[in-house]
Amino acid sequence: MSEAAAALRFTPALSRQLLSLTLAIATVGLQALMVAPLLTDMARDLAVGPAAIGRAVGLYGAGVAVAALIAAPRLDAWPRRRALALALAALGLALAGCALAADAVMLAVAMAACGLAAGVILPATYALAGDLAPQELRSRAVGRVIVGWSVAMVLGVPAAALLAEQLGWRGAYAVIAGVAGLAALAVLRLPAARQPEGARLVPYRVALAQPGVVRLLVMTLAYMMAFYGCYTFLTDHLRATDDLGPSLGGWISLSYGLGFGVAVLGDGLLDRWGPWRVAAPAFLVLAGLMLLLPLAAAESPWAVVVLALPWGVVNHFGLNVLVSLLSSGEPALRGAVMGLYSAVTYIAHFLAGAGLGLVYAGAGFTAVAVIAAAGLAVAATMAMLPAVRRV
């Protein structure tokens, strides 16, 4: 990439538009990630074990995957702003259902409904970010939008943990339902975006035929299973060995989110070096960090809080690599590809919650961390394969 391209800057209007998209991602990130610090209290209140809440989390992931698979061929023909606002409003209603759940079955149904809404929100948001930004700024634009995950962790998840201590986990869910409603209103204030030229109903085979897409989706599956498997059960593992409240999960999320957010300062390197060159090193470093998690947990919960900072930094680059590469293809197919990305992400979420939940219940957190590291090693190996890697 040329120095002139690297020197391009965001206009104030584009920055404001990306901020609204960041809020949408932050809302989804908050409701998806807040389960971790609340899991122990939710299980106790509903008289079930942690694995049952893990299965409910898995149904959330299944809901995202189903919605994204249904929406993926249509996202390039739908008015994205309207679809995004409606999905955020639906998310708010589903979160209210979580707050009112009388048992684990009702909670699982409400979480599945949250997933259906998120399955539209995520690909629509990523596709809009790709539409708004010029090619030379795309990695930086995507980096800004995915900072919503950092906002969710740095501010949202710790706040949810504190709310749970004051209002209970149900009160925390009720407050986040209101946040989803506010996010819907913010999206409605965006100017109507023009659909990419040639936007149409896109069959899956057309989206999957783009060079590199199938490989990247398999890498995404391994990558996301590693993250969600470790993150979902880490706090419960720590609380089982130390008598600490849900605020511990908030501290872990705060440290992770700070690392994830600070890493945005390095997103320009992805534009200059190219995402493929960053992929394998990032995945291998993450694999090493996964193996360190159970060792840190055995030492002290606060050792995990410290380790979460570099985890967040490296995970930012790994996620940006995947989203940037998948969103860099033909504009008229971008919505379909990002829909498939969201579907695969939350198939991984489902497998991590349901499948690795059984591993956690039977063999403990160390086994989960080893499986996560192995998945990341697979993703790194695929990134280094010599076949055509361009999307």
Where are these regions (language model features)?
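A late C-terminal transmembrane helix in Major Facilitator Superfamily
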Residues: P331-F365, A372
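Helix-loop-helix hairpin linking two adjacent transmembrane segments in secondary transporters
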Residues: Q135-L137, G143-R189
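Paired small-residue
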Residues: A94, V105-C114, W302-P310
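Helix-breaking motifs and short loop linkers at transmembrane-helix boundaries and internal kinks
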Residues: A47, P79, L100-M106, A296-A298
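Helix-to-loop junctions at the C-terminal end of transmembrane segments
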Residues: A67-P79, A263-P275, Y360
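Cytoplasmic helix-loop-helix junction between adjacent transmembrane helices
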Residues: M111-G148
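Conserved MFS/SLC helix-loop-helix module at the cytosolic interface between two early adjacent transmembrane helices
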Residues: V66-A102
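C-terminal transmembrane helical hairpin of 12-TM major facilitator-type secondary transporters
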Residues: R277-L322
